[in-house]
Amino acid sequence: MSEQQPQAPDAALELNNELKARREKLVALRATGLAFPNDFRRDRTSDQLHAEFDGKENEELEALGIEVSVAGRMMTRRIMGKASFVTLQDVGGRIQLYVSRDDLAEGIYNEQFKKWDLGDILGARGKLFKTKTGELSIHCSELRLLTKALRPLPDKFHGLADQETRYRQRYLDLIANDDSRNTFKIRSQIMAGIRSFMVDRDFMEVETPMMQAIPGGASARPFITHHNALDLDMYLRIAPELYLKRLVVGGFDRVFEINRNFRNEGISPRHNPEFTMMELYMAYADYKDLIELTESLFRTLAQDVLGSTVVPYGDQQFDFGKPFEKLTMKEAILKYRPQTDLADLADFDKSVAIAQSLGIKVEKSWGLGRLVTEIFEETAEAHLIQPTFITEYPAEVSPLARRNDMDPEITDRFEFFIGGREIGNGFSELNDAQDQAERFLQQVNAKDAGDDEAMFYDEDYVTALEHGLPPTAGLGIGIDRMVMLFTNSHTIRDVILFPALRPGSK
């Protein structure tokens, strides 16, 4: 973790002097009763103004005499005697203000405005016009200080150089960094787009417990908390899957949930302990239906949010307009490690040898299915750049998926990859209660053997299956990783507003 470098003595002294000066200005404001007013109302944002009026000439604007009210943070100011130009930043972007001493109430310009600081939040009212350079501006007839900023803008409005500060003080990052603001606007649009897509297909949004007595629905190490009133250890959920399928048992044929999951694991450019998932369950469907739905979802979001089905990412481009590639797990291994013999992947000892040759540490508890999966992850996963579905996952690593009718050693499951990363996981659900109970027991044995990510035995879920789960397909998509792809972000911390960080220095 990077730490902020200590400030040079001169810089620290300059900052302390500025902080002191700003606080003295606030004291003066309090004495006048003008500190922190709450009666100013804006009627437009900067992006609305630019969208509506950028195309008009100054003569047309003057003839229309359009008066608007805006509010935002003062980012720059150029004082030129009796007149000034201000850049005001709001949620939509920036708009220029023209401030003239003679157009404001007496004393406002010299006694107030010129004493305000960059970072202060202002309210402005005036008529639209365009400067000689063609920039849409507001000729202010009223200007008010709404909030006094007691600290200066980061790095004199040149952005934040320190990545750690960007994450730890996200509010500063959002003030200074246009790209960050745009990333989180796109994230919001993606979330809204997913909800619209699902509702249009008759899915019902639901909420399931975030604290669970038995963590389930995924293989991961959970966070543990304690319920004082019940005197009971509980777990932050690692997945909502088992609760969502209980709802399908109850008769809700199409359900989805967008919410946080928690996994007590490491932090990396692709992993955050608290992350957002969308999970859906659809009765009377199988994993092939989910492949079609996933392809349609990504294609729709790319077009609606970004305006194109071709999405740039680093030096690559992901094409969501073309049919997505589909490979079985073993086909992918053979494609990217052609020296592999297909027959070797059906032999335990030979698969062990392949895994060891790849530098994989083979655990005693692994069966053939886990070995093949590890070989796939080592040899093929990083090469799956364009949207690709990998199918035929071994039953050993798919404790909740339905076995394939032709080969019970594999399941009707897929994972969805883009840019060498897993983005989604879907399968035909296991609805055989007895088979599910047996697989839970296998997971318990694995946990007893030292696998702390193996699942617990969930007796109530087995009971729910005994009441009858219709043929069902389920899908989970990592929202954070999806946003990374759509915003050309290369670390998950860039797409989570407040990512997990080690405690910083004071």
Curated annotation (Swiss-Prot):
One of its GO terms (cellular component) is cytosol. Homodimer. This is Lysine--tRNA ligase. The keyword tRNA processing does not apply. It comes from the Bacteria. It is an enzyme of class 6 (ligase). It is found in: Cytoplasm. Binds 3 Mg(2+) ions per subunit. Belongs to the class-II aminoacyl-tRNA synthetase family. It catalyses: tRNA(Lys) + L-lysine + ATP = L-lysyl-tRNA(Lys) + AMP + diphosphate. Its cofactor is Mg(2+). Mg(2+) 2 binds at residue 422. It holds the Pfam family tRNA_anti-codon. NCBIfam families: lysS_bact (TIGR00499), PRK00484.1 (NF001756), PRK12445.1 (NF009101). Its EC number is 6.1.1.6. Keywords: Aminoacyl-tRNA synthetase, ATP-binding, Cytoplasm, Ligase, Magnesium, Metal-binding, Nucleotide-binding, Protein biosynthesis. GO terms for biological process: lysyl-tRNA aminoacylation. Mg(2+) 1 binds at residues 415, 422. GO terms for molecular function: ATP binding; lysine-tRNA ligase activity; magnesium ion binding; tRNA binding.
